[in-house]
Amino acid sequence: MAETAAGLCRFKANYAVERKIEPFYKGGKAQLDQTGRHLFCVCGTKVNILDVASGDLIRSLEQEDQEDITAFDLSPDDEVLVTASRALLLAQWAWREGTVARLWKAIHTAPVASMAFDATSTLLATGGCDGAVRVWDIVQHYGTHHFRGSPGVVHLVAFHPDPTRLLLFSSAVDTSIRVWSLQDRSCLAVLTAHYSAVTSLSFSEDGHTMLSSGRDKICIVWDLRSYETSRTVPVFESVEASVLLPEEPALALGVKNSGLHFLTAGDQGILRVWEAASGQCVYTQPQMSGLRQELTHCTLARAAGLLLTVTADHNLLLYEARSLQLQKQFAGYSEEVLDVRFLGPNDSHIIVASNSPCLKVFELQTLACQILHGHTDIVLALDVFRKGWLFASCAKDQSIRIWRMNKAGQVACVAQGSGHTHSVGTICCSRLKESFLVTGSQDCTVKLWPLPEALPSKNTASDGDLIPLQAQSTQRCHDKDINSLAVSPNDKLLATGSQDRTAKLWALPQCQLLGVFSGHRRGLWNVQFSPTDQVLATASADGTIKLWALQDFSCLKTFEGHDASVLKVAFVSRGAQLLSSGSDGLLKLWTIKSNECVRTLDAHEDKVWGLHCSRLDDHAITGGSDSRIILWKDVTEAEQAEEQAKREEQVIKQQELDNLLHEKRYLRALGLAISLDRPHTVLTVIQAIRRDPEACEKLEATVLRLRRDQKEALLRFCITWNTNSRHCHEAQAVLGVLLRHEAPEELLAYDGVRGALEALLPYTERHFQRLSRTLQAATFLDFLWHNMKLSPLPAAPPAL
């Protein structure tokens, strides 16, 4: 069985996390700096800062209270970032260093819902859920204004772009816009024309015009000189954001007339440009295929010429403002990752299916993201053909799609098929060549789909008409949902796993039943063929993995160790080992021959639905319900090489230590013995040094020359020595040197020094009492010696 492959490959012993793709945006505000190089977005208790060019997370800013961030804003000069948390605290950040420059109470009686800087970057306005609007001077560090009068949550605040006019605009749940004068400390006007929540305010470059948008499907142009409505434009969608465009970007989009133009983003999921004077839509972004994605946010970075939009499923899209050409895509939050696969001939990309109709393709080196639209319901499973250019997906919309990546790394849908009557939950591609694929559905049937020869090549990724797929055969295979399919390496066999607790083996292409694998106590989540042996692996909700012989359908081995359902299993090390993932969030590496789990990997916090191994068998990718995607690297050889190097270094150092001890060069031997972690040898060296008449000076000089980590190790050794009355003198001698020559602040900085002192105190007191008693006894003996008087000898008898 797997023993034959084991002799040709090295067993794996460990995997290490090489890279993580984690959520960095979970809804709320997202903002670009003026240069367009950094992206700021909210993720729970943090504000994450991304490098737009590389997609890397530069820094995460989190307040000490660790409460959710309710609002934030970056100053126009890009120097100051202010965040507000649910704990009613405002934090002023030097965001480039990641440090808090100032922390103060918001004084609001409810969380801050909105925030905005003025054009000078000195004044900050905060709108609270308590209906109050406050203005702060962040340079002089005091509150300047407090405005009341808004009913309910103030969800929108904005300063007039001309700082000399000292005007502040706010909007609350009453759908009106209030204009506040900072100079008079009063409300100048209340603009009432919307019939639903106002979602955004935008100002013209001359400061005389303001545009407001709302969920009442209208945008209103206001004259700020008279505070009257200039134009009401029906846009026929609930608008979440609108932006007044500078003249140059509007003309670049093919708009012929001059004048004010504005862009809207809303529940239709497309960007549209409107002419303010006529109220006509002059540009409509082409609609993407698939389910419509509502846009929840839109902002323009004028200096950088970039437009940032956010979709309802937390994807962030960057457009070039002049042409509205898509520049970058970021997947802020993948929700529950249902499947993940390597893509490309060199496994340079990964595909991710999550709780969304959209697929996400990441380039592993740069984490550049492509968002693929096509399915109209949640994508459930993925599989990749052997060469890596072509892959397939299936979804709850009862359809399947074929996608191809071209040499430039761009992915497009090339074929589509439908025919199942329920959600398509699993899909599997042919292994030898791109000839067919198999799908399994909740309708308990399996369909075989031959691939047409007219598919585009890898040199192109056409967005033209999709090629229709036709099912060649349909077979009812199980009595319950089919959860997994696997095609054998020679494309001759098909394995199916179902909720009915059985796996079945079928002959292809006729879909003829060959046998049934029975033995699991609960439904099966995954089935996999061995790449080298005639063996099938099954993973079940009963927490076990079983290996089955294809010849007689008998169970060869059972692997137990997961505390919950085993969701995925994969053969690694040329079929000699198994890698499994479970709903307990753990990955386990099993050796088939010994039937043992050699390593348990814990990096996920919830179910691990996706597991796939690379072509070279040196990497694995996992995705789970915790929205994490983790790239694992096989570090067995690296760890073995590191261990071998350590052993060789230990041998060399041990020989050097033996030579030093033989030559009685104790001072040099002390540091070497400490680095080798040899407490007994260190004790022997100190005892030898103390036998020297000049022991105190030599011991002090030697100990003080040690590095800090060596002193920490020596202190740990002293704890052990101090427990023994025969060795306590050496421990006390070392301790005395450290206490006499190290400042208390330096000692407290030692690793574990508090615990060390607590361990030293009781034995030191015991030794002190014992030595005190010994000294008293010796003093008493000395006293007796000096005070003893011999009685006179008796006189000799007289001689006769």
Curated annotation (Swiss-Prot):
Pfam families: Utp13 (PF08625), WD40 (PF00400). One of its GO terms (cellular component) is small-subunit processome. InterPro entries: G-protein_beta_WD-40_rep, Quinoprotein_ADH-like_sf, Utp13_C, WD40/YVTN_repeat-like_dom_sf, WD40_repeat_CS, WD40_repeat_dom_sf, WD40_rpt. There is a cross-link at K407 (Glycyl lysine isopeptide (Lys-Gly) (interchain with G-Cter in SUMO2)). The modification N-acetylalanine is found at A2. PROSITE patterns: WD_REPEATS_1, WD_REPEATS_2, WD_REPEATS_REGION. GO terms for molecular function: U3 snoRNA binding. WD repeats lie at residues 64-105, 107-146, 149-190, 193-232, 245-284, 290-329, 332-372, 374-413, 419-459, 477-516, 519-560, 562-602, 604-642. GO terms for biological process: endonucleolytic cleavage in 5'-ETS of tricistronic rRNA transcript (SSU-rRNA, 5.8S rRNA, LSU-rRNA); endonucleolytic cleavage to generate mature 5'-end of SSU-rRNA from (SSU-rRNA, 5.8S rRNA, LSU-rRNA); ribosomal small subunit biogenesis. Keywords: Acetylation, Isopeptide bond, Nucleus, Repeat, Ubl conjugation, WD repeat. It is found in: Nucleus, Nucleolus. SUPFAM superfamilies: Quinoprotein alcohol dehydrogenase-like, WD40 repeat-like. The keyword Repeat applies. Part of the small subunit (SSU) processome, first precursor of the small eukaryotic ribosomal subunit. During the assembly of the SSU processome in the nucleolus, many ribosome biogenesis factors, an RNA chaperone and ribosomal proteins associate with the nascent pre-rRNA and work in concert to generate RNA folding, modifications, rearrangements and cleavage as well as targeted degradation of pre-ribosomal RNA by the RNA exosome. Part of the small subunit (SSU) processome, composed of more than 70 proteins and the RNA chaperone small nucleolar RNA (snoRNA) U3. This is Transducin beta-like protein 3. It comes from Rattus norvegicus (Rat).
